[in-house]
Amino acid sequence: MAKKENRIIITLECTEARKEGLTPSRYTTTKNKKNNTERLVLKKYNPNLKKHTEHKEIK
């Protein structure tokens, strides 16, 4: 019997663009839900704002 996979696909969304009412940039990535139980926060590039911003995991 196969084990249940621990890696899940998540979506990261820009928080600064959301506050300003602009179109937020989104990235998809994977995370290990066994090691990282809380929501993921990464600094990624937002092409709409042309700078690196904080991206948070969304449902």
Curated annotation (Swiss-Prot):
Please give the Pfam families that the UniProt record associates with this protein.
Ribosomal_L33
Query: Its Gene Ontology biological processes?
Result: translation
Region entry Disordered, spans? 26-59
What GO CC annotations are associated with the protein?
A: cytoplasm; ribonucleoprotein complex; ribosome
Organism superkingdom: Bacteria
An MF annotation (GO) of this entry: structural constituent of ribosome
**Swiss-Prot/TrEMBL keywords:** Ribonucleoprotein, Ribosomal protein
Which InterPro entries does this one have? Ribosomal_bL33, Ribosomal_bL33_sf, Ribosomal_zn-bd
Question: What Gene3D superfamilies does UniProt report for this protein, alphabetically?
Answer: Ribosomal protein L33 (2.20.28.120)
Its family remark reads: Belongs to the bacterial ribosomal protein bL33 family.
NCBIfam families the UniProt entry points to: PRK00504.1, PRK00595.1, rpmG_bact
Protein's UniProt name:
Large ribosomal subunit protein bL33
Record the organism: Chlorobium phaeobacteroides (strain BS1)
